[in-house]
């Protein structure tokens, strides 16, 4: 990392007592020491996601990769988040194996959609933000505090969003302060201006395929009884989104590329093994590819069978 003034140290020396004399949570020189992004904004703003840099302005938004689609579902005792792997650049497929779901701390996961470069930096910086706060304050942020921190970061990207480079996260986590462990799963969506909303319906999706994914989850959410069934509904929703949205990638059985997913519960956040996702995706594809319901030899369906 390069600081604006190399002749001055980025941090005061410990011998000066500049930091040690400060109580926890107090700002220093107008900078909130417990917020890494706030510190970065004052010391090296060009390193923040979406910060203007050298080069031509007015770059077409389809000239950079975009990622979609993310889904999240609450289940008894936790929450599940999953994302497809495709990134598009205009009408081209820029990548087929993008990672869009990131574990940001022990009980929080972030899914990203929109301008890929900015969205990935959001997820990484947010993970550092949470770790930085815990180290300085000695305690982890509450879940509402995590929401506010991420909302502030999203709001800081408003200038780039107004130019078309929108990056929207989807936050999911387990609220340790909820007295009812079975209902401690949380899903929070954001808009480009930093506004946020706790999802009470139990599911949410962001990205270009979100309208199709949400329609699928709306029909299947009643089947969610645990993390396993929630994971299956998430895969079904991503499959439906890929079926109608060209920017969303479905399970790629030929290349062995499948969605990624994270399950969060009282024991923390855990990535779902690829073998498990692969098996579930193959089962979904097989169930939707039965010869008696698809293809030129399919038996016509009578009206009374609908």
From Swiss-Prot:
UniProt KW Hydrolase keyword: yes
Reactions catalysed, as given in the entry: Cleavage of peptide bonds with very broad specificity
Control of this protein's activity: The formation of the proteasomal ATPase ARC-20S proteasome complex, likely via the docking of the C-termini of ARC into the intersubunit pockets in the alpha-rings, may trigger opening of the gate for substrate entry. Interconversion between the open-gate and close-gate conformations leads to a dynamic regulation of the 20S proteasome proteolysis activity.
Keyword Cytoplasm set for record: yes
Entry EC no(s): 3.4.25.1
GO biological process, one term: modification-dependent protein catabolic process
Pathway: Protein degradation; proteasomal Pup-dependent pathway
CDD domains per the UniProt record, alphabetical: proteasome_protease_HslV
Keywords noted in UniProt: Autocatalytic cleavage, Cytoplasm, Hydrolase, Protease, Proteasome, Threonine protease, Zymogen
Pfam families in the cross-refs: Proteasome
Functional note: Component of the proteasome core, a large protease complex with broad specificity involved in protein degradation.
Subunit structure: The 20S proteasome core is composed of 14 alpha and 14 beta subunits that assemble into four stacked heptameric rings, resulting in a barrel-shaped structure. The two inner rings, each composed of seven catalytic beta subunits, are sandwiched by two outer rings, each composed of seven alpha subunits. The catalytic chamber with the active sites is on the inside of the barrel. Has a gated structure, the ends of the cylinder being occluded by the N-termini of the alpha-subunits. Is capped by the proteasome-associated ATPase, ARC.
Protein name per UniProt: Proteasome subunit beta
Organism from which the protein derives: Mycolicibacterium vanbaalenii (strain DSM 7251 / JCM 13017 / BCRC 16820 / KCTC 9966 / NRRL B-24157 / PYR-1) (Mycobacterium vanbaalenii)
Upper classification of the organism: Bacteria, Bacillati, Actinomycetota, Actinomycetes, Mycobacteriales
Gene that this sequence comes from: prcB
């Amino acid at each position: 990392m390069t600081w604006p003034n190399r002749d001055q140290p980025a941090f005061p020396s410990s011998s000066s007592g500049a930091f040690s004399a400060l109580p926890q949570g107090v700002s220093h020189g107008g900078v909130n020491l417990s917020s890494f992004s706030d510190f970065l904004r004052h010391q090296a703003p060009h390193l923040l996601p979406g910060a203007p840099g050298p080069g031509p302005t007015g770059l077409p938004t389809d000239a950079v990769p975009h990622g979609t689609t993310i889904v999240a579902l609450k289940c008894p005792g936790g929450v599940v988040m999953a994302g497809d792997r495709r990134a598009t650049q205009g009408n081209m497929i820029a990548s087929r194996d993008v990672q869009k779901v990131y574990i940001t701390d022990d009980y929080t996961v972030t899914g990203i959609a929109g301008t890929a470069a900015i969205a990935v930096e959001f997820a990484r910086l947010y993970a550092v933000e949470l770790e930085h706060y815990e180290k300085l304050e000695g305690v982890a942020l509450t879940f509402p505090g995590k929401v506010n921190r991420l909302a502030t970061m999203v709001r800081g990207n408003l200038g780039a969003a107004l130019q078309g480079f929108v990056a929207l996260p989807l936050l999911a986590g387990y609220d340790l302060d909820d007295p009812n462990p079975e209902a401690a799963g949380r899903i929070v969506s954001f808009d480009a201006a930093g506004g946020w909303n706790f999802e009470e319906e139990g599911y949410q999706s962001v990205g270009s395929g979100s309208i199709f994914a949400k329609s699928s989850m709306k029909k299947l959410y009643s089947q969610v009884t645990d993390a396993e069934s929630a994971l299956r509904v998430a895969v079904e929703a991503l499959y439906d989104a890929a079926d109608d949205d060209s920017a969303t990638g479905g399970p790629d059985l030929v290349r062995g590329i499948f969605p990624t997913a994270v399950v969060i519960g009282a024991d923390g956040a855990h990535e779902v093994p690829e073998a498990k996702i692969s098996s579930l995706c193959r089962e979904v594809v097989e169930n939707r590819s039965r010869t008696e319901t698809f293809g030129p030899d399919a038996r016509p369906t009578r009206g009374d069978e609908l």
